[in-house]
């Protein structure tokens, strides 16, 4: 476990994000890389001459599940959410020469739930990797934060995330509102070394370019929530 875990909650609140360097040692990062390399469940794995995305990591990997519940990560998350944080989804993203895509400006608007139940304010619905995903009310998204754990050095050369600070406070944006915000706002590239963590609000506008070099950009993206869902809806990870 790294020693440079100081980060200010006041960084997350106005800007919607914070970068925490050296959270994990090199040996810990190597262990995480080894653990995800053994996952073979075809329903959650996306590959093209090598794996470039794995959904359902909380279910597929005991190591990632332990990571998500670890005090090392949750202490940072709970300081921001000001309460207990529940890991509700984890995904691996990688950019390789064979899977080197760009991601346009967007907000993260969907959550993963145990079953499809019609509840006012929830929709539309989609099915991904065998699980139900739905757009919840904005208030649910405002009570969430994501921890992006970097397994490789990440910079503009290999598709680092770009953010527009403060846009999480604008609520849910339409396509035209996103375009206008991007046109009139300055963005920031989030360069993070392996072992570092980027904390970000789901409603924060973000994008990434295709990498310009042939290298990995592996990130474990864990979503945390501080609230229960409405009606009989349950987070997919707490349905038992």
State what each model feature region is.
Residues 2-15, 24-194, 207, 211-215, ...:
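Non-heme Fe(II) oxygenase catalytic core, chiefly the N-lobe of the double-stranded beta-helix
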Residues 238-240:
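Glycine- and charge-enriched low-complexity intrinsically disordered segments
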Residues 21, 165, 201:
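Residue-level detector of conserved, well-ordered beta-strand and adjacent loop positions
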């Amino acid at each position: 476990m790294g020693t440079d875990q100081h980060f200010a909650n006041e960084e997350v609140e106005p800007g919607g994000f914070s970068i925490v360097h050296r959270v994990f040692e090199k040996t810990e990062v190597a262990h995480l890389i080894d653990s995800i390399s053994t996952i073979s469940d075809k329903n959650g794995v996306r590959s093209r001459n090598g794996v470039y995305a794995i959904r359902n990591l909380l279910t597929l990997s005991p190591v990632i599940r332990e990571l998500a519940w670890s005090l090392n990560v949750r202490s940072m998350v709970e300081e921001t959410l000001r309460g207990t944080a529940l890991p509700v989804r984890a995904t691996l993203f990688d950019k390789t020469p064979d899977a080197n895509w760009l991601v346009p400006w967007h907000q993260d608007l969907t959550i993963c739930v145990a079953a499809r139940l019609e509840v006012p304010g929830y929709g539309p619905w989609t099915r991904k990797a065998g699980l139900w995903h739905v757009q919840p009310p904005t208030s649910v998204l405002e009570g969430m934060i994501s921890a992006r754990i970097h397994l490789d050095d990440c910079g503009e050369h290999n598709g680092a995330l770009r953010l527009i600070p403060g846009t999480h406070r604008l609520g849910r944006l339409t396509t035209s509102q996103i375009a206008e915000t991007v046109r009139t706002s300055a963005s920031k590239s989030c360069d993070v070394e392996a072992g570092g963590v980027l904390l970000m609000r789901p409603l924060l506008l973000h994008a990434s370019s295709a990498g310009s070099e042939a290298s990995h950009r592996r990130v474990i993206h864990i979503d945390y929530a501080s609230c229960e869902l409405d009606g009989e809806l349950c987070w997919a990870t707490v349905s038992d």
